[in-house]
Amino acid sequence: FLKYVTDVYIEKKEEYTKKYEGNEERVKRALERERFIVPEESSFYFLYENRSSPKIGEMINHALAELEEANREKLGGHDGSNIFRNIDFNSSNLGDAKGKVTRLRTLLNDFYPLILSSSHLESNDVIGGAYEFLIANFASDSGKKAGEFFTPAEVSTLLAKLTKSKSGSRIYD
């Protein structure tokens, strides 16, 4: 998620810089209206530059907290909870101090070469696609009961193509 929002944010920043001929104030205002705001220390690339730090777990936790704060309306729950607060990249579950840094560095190294900006992806809805993937796997792993409520996108598309809708027609799921 962090790599995706960082790449999209950087791409938008480059677009606005070109559009507004380097006027930083206009670029800043335009970026504030984007889907997500990515503070500098929350950027994937900031973390990547610091990937060998013995405090990389704490840095990732801080980056996610700052990202939540900058996007409170989108990433905060209605009850005031935040989606990343229960994730701890500094947890002893990741191993001893050296092992933890190694694992997190490897994770950052694996994501670094991927370009996840909108112009490089087949679909702009990466988050929706990931969510649909998780729901589909939950439905198939949970048996028929959970699967009763999930219709794969391919089935929906096929049904839409097979039905010849007429003006005023309605389709119900």
Explain the meaning of each model-derived region.
Residues 1-167:
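Non-catalytic, mostly N-terminal accessory regions of nucleic-acid modification and defense proteins
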